[in-house]
Design a protein with these regions (language model features):
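N-terminal secretory signal peptides that target proteins for export/translocation
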Residues: 1-2
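Bacterial N-terminal signal peptides
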Residues: 5-16
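Beta-propeller blade termini and top-face loops
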Residues: 21-204
Length: 204
């Protein structure tokens, strides 16, 4: 019995020594992560920039707000509460929002914030809603990437002008001033020989 106890002690000591000599495998552990803190590494600005605001002329409690990197938001109680109305569409970056002066329930949105900066996102054209932002339809100019302004002719809702900047870091694309006379079904460039257009004066 005494011999068995001695043998057991020897075996236990052998395994203890073996475990003590096992090298520690490299890897992440709690001490590693304690030295790290979350920090912003970009883009420069992720949201919060208001690109445009449109207010219903027939109901001043209804506003539409285009956010540079946050879609389109709507309030029906003069900003007490807000609802995102563009989240299911193809672009989160918005350059402008415009209401049809003849029917403010028709909303036009130009995607792609109109800012020349490394933080900016690009869009995929012009969108239209005929029901106050519930549903949307892409109306073209998908290669414009950055739209600064949309204006609807108050004398004819089928006539729309779009100021498109085009791609920031390359040539081509849909850039310039575009006009539609059929409600956005077709577009014709009326200004811009290879140059983008960011604004227009609609006092005509």
């Amino acid at each position: 019995m005494k011999a068995l106890k001695i043998a057991a002690l020897v075996v236990t000591g052998f395994f203890s020594l073996a475990n003590a000599e096992e090298p520690v495998e490299p890897g992440f552990n709690e001490a590693t992560f304690k030295g790290l803190e979350f920090r912003s590494i970009g883009p420069a600005f992720m949201s919060g920039r208001i690109a445009d605001i449109a207010i219903d002329p027939t109901d001043p409690s209804v506003w539409y707000v285009a956010v540079g990197s946050g879609g389109v938001w709507k309030t029906e109680n003069a900003s007490t509460t807000w609802t995102p109305i563009f989240d299911d569409q193809g672009s989160y970056s918005i350059g402008c929002v415009t209401l049809d002066p003849n029917n403010p329930n028709t909303v036009w949105v130009g995607t792609g914030e109109n800012v020349s900066g490394r933080h900016v996102g690009y869009g995929d054209g012009v969108y239209r809603s005929r029901d106050g932002g519930t549903t949307w339809e892409n109306m073209g100019l998908e290669k414009s990437e950055h739209i600064g302004m949309i204006r609807v002719d108050p004398r004819d809702s089928n006539t729309i002008f779009v100021a498109a900047q085009g791609p920031l870091w390359s040539g081509g694309g849909d850039r310039g001033l575009f006009k539609s006379t059929d409600g956005g079904k077709n577009w014709r460039k009326v200004l811009g020989d290879g140059h983008g257009n960011t604004d227009l004066d609609d006092r005509y």
